[in-house]
């Protein structure tokens, strides 16, 4: 019975662990080649890569011991590695988008519009404060004029 499960499980290990590992290595090379910054979120990526290699090694080192506990252990290892892989793929995609020129252009435009909005607000506040000063100066002047000497 265990001999029938083994090739299917090894195929699952190959496609769901080894292929994402290759994708990560490509993305990591791409990110390190085209950015000036060290990406700290790649540290858990290194751990998940090591974890993936451990799972692959575990699948090859215990081929004859096919009891239910080892199958369950390997299943959970694959599941945890998949969850880590999707999380890291999302993180790396976000970093790639942030570092891209298109995102930088969008951010610069947003900064420009934000600066112009703040300048307009500052001008409006300055006009309002000038009007209030003039009004208060006129009131003070009128009060001073009315006082008998």
Curated annotation (Swiss-Prot):
Keyword Transmembrane helix belongs to the record: yes
Main subcellular localisation: membrane
Annotated keywords: Cell membrane, Membrane, Transmembrane, Transmembrane helix
Bilayer disposition of the protein: Multi-pass membrane protein
GO cellular-component term (any): plasma membrane
Location(s), subcellular: Cell membrane
Organism name: Mycoplasma genitalium (strain ATCC 33530 / DSM 19775 / NCTC 10195 / G37) (Mycoplasmoides genitalium)
UniProt name for this protein: Uncharacterized protein MG384.1
Transmembrane segments: 12-32, 42-62, 69-89
KW Cell membrane (keyword) present: yes
């Amino acid at each position: 019975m265990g001999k029938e499960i083994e090739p299917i499980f090894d195929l699952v290990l190959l496609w769901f662990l080894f292929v994402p590992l290759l994708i990560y290595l490509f993305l990591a090379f791409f990110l390190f080649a085209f950015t000036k910054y060290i990406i700290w979120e790649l540290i858990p990526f290194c751990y998940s890569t090591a974890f993936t290699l451990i799972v692959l090694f575990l699948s090859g080192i215990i081929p004859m011991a096919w009891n239910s506990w080892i199958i369950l252990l390997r299943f959970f290892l694959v599941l945890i590695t998949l969850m880590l892989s999707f999380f890291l793929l999302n993180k790396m995609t976000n970093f790639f988008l942030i570092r891209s020129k298109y995102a930088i252009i969008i951010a610069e435009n947003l900064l420009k519009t934000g600066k112009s909005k703040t300048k307009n607000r500052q001008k409006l506040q300055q006009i309002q404060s000038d009007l209030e000063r003039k009004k208060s100066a006129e009131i003070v002047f009128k009060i001073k004029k009315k006082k008998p000497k």
